[in-house]
Regions:
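Concave beta-strand-loop units of leucine-rich repeat
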Residues: 1-208, 217-225
């Protein structure tokens, strides 16, 4: 097993103690521990896995404290933390991970105050913030993520007022606003972002006329409704 590259333990009963046996898998690049009872203590056993490129911890018992054990995984490109107890301040431990491109924080306790730790991850090109506690007040700060191409804000309270900054993300290709309180005012905002290729407005207040106008003015964009 020394040369194992991928290991999937999704939905198993693997424990923190059990993860101790993974510490010698020095070649592993992809590890999926989603939907397991793993806690911060278990992550301490993964700190030596410095070849990891993808780590999935969604719906585990991991908190901000556990992220300190990931701080030396400089090859990490993707990190799944959705559905965990993360509040956000633990993301400061990931600042040195210059290869980190994708992070999932959906369904966590992330809020306006802790978003500042997210925007320090400058290499991100995909960010999932579905179902978090973010509001219009903090969303403009995302402009500093200049490499961002995919942003999911579904099921948040973000409205048109918080999206006036959208033109500041010139590389944004996909925007998820499913079940957000946005209406036809969104049309003028996103039409200033002609590079958009996917826009999810399912469950919003956008009218039929609004959708038609979007499709007319953004002919290259797939409108999901």
């Amino acid at each position: 097993l020394k040369y194992l590259k991928k290991l999937g333990l999704l939905g198993t009963n693997v424990t923190d103690e059990g993860l101790r046996y993974l510490s010698d898998l020095s070649s592993i690049q992809v590890l999926n521990l989603a939907y397991t009872p793993v806690t911060d203590r278990g992550l301490a056993n993964l700190a030596s896995l410095l070849q990891l490129e993808e780590l999935f911890l969604g719906d585990t018992l991991v908190t901000d404290g556990g992220l300190a054990h990931l701080g030396m995984m400089t090859k990490l490109k993707g990190l799944g933390l959705s559905g965990t107890r993360i509040q956000g301040h633990g993301l400061k431990h990931l600042k040195r991970l210059g290869a980190l491109e994708r992070i999932g924080l959906s369904g966590t306790l992330l809020n306006d105050q802790s978003l500042k730790f997210v925007i320090e991850l400058k290499s991100l090109n995909a960010l999932s913030l579905r179902g978090t506690q973010l509001t219009d007040a903090s969303i403009p700060a995302l402009q500093s993520l200049e490499s961002l191409q995919v942003l999911w804000l579904d099921r948040t309270s973000v409205s048109e007022a918080g999206l006036e900054w959208i033109t500041g993300l010139s590389g944004l290709r996909e925007l998820g606003l499913r079940n957000c309180p946005v209406g036809d005012g969104l049309v003028e905002l996103v039409c200033n972002a002609p590079q958009l290729r996917v826009l999810n407005v399912f469950g919003t207040k956008l009218t039929e006329d609004g959708v038609a106008e979007l499709q007319k003015r953004l002919p290259d964009c797939e409108i999901i409704r």
